[in-house]
Amino acid sequence: MSDPTIRPQSELTPGDFTAAENPFALFAEWLAEANKSEPNDPNAMALATVDPDGLPDVRMVLMKGYDEHGFVFYSHIASQKGRELAANPKAALLFHWKSLRRQIRIRGTVTPVTDTEADAYFATRPKQAQIGAWASKQSQPLESRFAFEQAIAKVTARHLIGDVPRPPGWSGWRITPSRIEFWHDRPFRLHDRIEFRRDTPDHPWTKTRLYP
């Protein structure tokens, strides 16, 4: 049985997205459509980093903001991704929207967000998620689930009243893209692909159409 959330190829209309000149504007259009069609987390993206031995790591994270300066996500600074980004501040992202038969690939350099940005976003999180950020030692060995629940209980007891401040080891990163590629599924694997490249954030984008 086919998935009713996935648009059949016969209903796909490629539009004229290959005529776009601003990749951020096109990203905003595609994300808006994904917000309507994706059943879960349209802002989910695969984040790829590299360890000191050159081996890649990839995991799903949630994009929590974007503008023409880049794409933002948050996590623990001492996590595996945080350590790898500190050693090699370059990353790749992938958005895949199955319901739309589209994907966007992004490569770029990574910089930490400001404390002001991190504080502002942390304040919007549910209190239980804020407590979890204090209780978790992300990517470190965990003796048992019970040990984690004990840590959560201790943090909860400390913050029964009032706001929960942002942990000093929890913050965010911004990926400033040097390359953004848009891919749209077409019948018989004759897909549409366009790629935007720039040498630095101050340079204009160069657009190229790619073979599928």
UniProtKB/Swiss-Prot annotation:
Binding-site positions, FMN: R59, M60, V61, L62, M63, K64, Y74, S75, K81, Q103, Q138, S139, W183, R193
Pathway terms, separated by semicolons: Cofactor metabolism; pyridoxal 5'-phosphate salvage; pyridoxal 5'-phosphate from pyridoxamine 5'-phosphate: step 1/1; Cofactor metabolism; pyridoxal 5'-phosphate salvage; pyridoxal 5'-phosphate from pyridoxine 5'-phosphate: step 1/1
Binding site for substrate: K64, Y121, R125, R189, L190, H191
Gene Ontology MF terms: FMN binding; pyridoxamine phosphate oxidase activity
Cofactor(s), by name: FMN
Keyword Nuclease belongs to the record: no
EC number(s) per entry: 1.4.3.5
Reaction catalysis annotation: pyridoxamine 5'-phosphate + O2 + H2O = pyridoxal 5'-phosphate + H2O2 + NH4(+); pyridoxine 5'-phosphate + O2 = pyridoxal 5'-phosphate + H2O2
InterPro entries: Pyridox_Oxase, Pyridox_Oxase_CS, Pyridox_Oxase_N, Pyridoxamine_oxidase_dimer_C, Split_barrel_FMN-bd
Keyword tags: Flavoprotein, FMN, Oxidoreductase, Pyridoxine biosynthesis
Cofactor, free-text remark: Binds 1 FMN per subunit.
Keyword set includes Transcription regulation: no
GO biological process, one term: pyridoxine biosynthetic process
HAMAP family named among the record's database cross-references: PdxH
Protein family per UniProt: Belongs to the pyridoxamine 5'-phosphate oxidase family.
Function: Catalyzes the oxidation of either pyridoxine 5'-phosphate (PNP) or pyridoxamine 5'-phosphate (PMP) into pyridoxal 5'-phosphate (PLP).
Oligomeric and partner information: Homodimer.
Name of the protein described by the UniProt record: Pyridoxine/pyridoxamine 5'-phosphate oxidase
Source species of the chain: Rhodopseudomonas palustris (strain TIE-1)
Gene name of the encoded protein: pdxH
